[in-house]
Design a protein with these regions (language model features):
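Cytoplasmic-side transmembrane-helix entry/capping segments in multi-pass membrane proteins
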Residues: 40-49, 96-108, 127-128, 152-162, ...
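Specific transmembrane alpha-helical segments of multi-pass solute transporters/efflux pumps
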Residues: 29-77, 113, 198-216
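Helix-helix packing/entry segments at the starts of transmembrane helices
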Residues: 14-16, 70-80, 144-167, 198-237
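Transmembrane alpha-helical segments that form core, pore/gating elements
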Residues: 2, 11, 21-26, 84-86, ...
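Membrane-interface helix-cap regions at the ends of transmembrane helices
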Residues: 2-3, 7, 21-39, 52, ...
Length: 279
């Protein structure tokens, strides 16, 4: 994202990464001659998932990375599995076990230490709240997929979500994208960064993630986000970002709590009704 921001605005990065991922998956969908399973009643859930799980995080994360660093932003994504447990109660009617409650409380304490450390290092409270809104919207989107869109094949679901997010973000990137200096040295780097982010980091990665959500449930699928904060810290350290001992300790604590919560969370794929799938 840092490389892409050399020439492209944050909203533009979100728009073009979603469009790039959608383009690749659409080509695969057409070549494979897949039959569409989308129904008119899926429109509202699809729009909600596209905005909460794609448009919002993909457009706000580049701005946050520029302000508070990729390592700190990546750490907040580690909260996704714990927040999924909380969101699953009202959206899916799934109540946490005592072990999961313990893990959520422990992770919230670690998150409090992480926020306190950020405030001590002059990170604006508004930036912290926006950063933690990302795993929250991810959790809501994951549960929404499980509740209302699980009858859609993962390829079609991901393709439609990315296309919808692109339709939302592309006009916004033109109206409120801001100006960036474009030069011959930075433009190829920024373009390559967005292309890689769109095709690999958004298209194929989200396709695999949505398949996990549908097959194993949002909690187990969100376990893959454990790799995000670890990779973000390593990348941030290599990129010269300031990483404190408190941040590392809080990250380790969050990962431990996530491991406790997700122990044995995988489940067998539930049967899918042949007629009248949930809308």
């Amino acid at each position: 994202m840092k490389r892409a921001m050399l020439c492209i605005s944050p909203v533009g990065i979100g728009a073009w990464r979603d469009f790039g991922g959608a383009l690749v998956l659409t080509l695969i969908f057409v070549v494979a001659r897949r039959q569409t399973s989308f129904r008119r009643s899926d429109l509202l859930p699809l729009l909600g998932v596209a905005i909460l799980g794609f448009a919002w995080p993909h457009s706000i994360q580049p701005e946050l990375v520029g302000r508070i660093g990729g390592a700190f932003v990546g750490m907040t994504v580690g909260m996704t599995p714990l927040l999924t447990i909380l969101v699953s109660v009202p959206m899916l009617g799934v109540y946490p076990t005592s072990r999961q409650v313990f893990g959520v409380i422990g992770a919230l304490l670690c998150m409090a230490f992480l926020m306190r450390d950020g405030l001590r290092h002059h990170v604006a409270l508004s930036d912290l709240l926006v950063a933690f809104s990302v795993p929250t919207t991810y959790s809501i989107a994951n549960c929404w997929i499980r509740r209302s869109l699980r009858h859609l094949p993962p390829l079609e679901l991901t393709m439609l979500c990315l296309l919808t997010a692109s339709v939302v973000l592309l006009p916004l990137s033109l109206m409120a994208g801001g100006q960036r200096t474009i030069d011959s040295q930075n433009w190829p780097v920024a373009l390559a960064a967005v292309a890689t982010l769109g095709v690999a980091g958004t298209g194929f990665a989200t396709l695999l993630f949505n398949k996990l959500v549908q097959d194993q449930g949002p909690l187990f699928a969100s376990m893959t986000t454990n790799l995000v904060p670890v990779g973000a810290v390593i990348w941030g350290w290599a990129d010269g970002e300031h990483i404190t001992i408190t941040q590392v300790a809080a990250l380790v604590g969050i990962l431990v709590m996530v491991t406790i919560v997700q122990f044995g969370s995988a489940q067998s794929p539930p049967p899918v009704a042949p007629v009248e799938p949930p809308a």
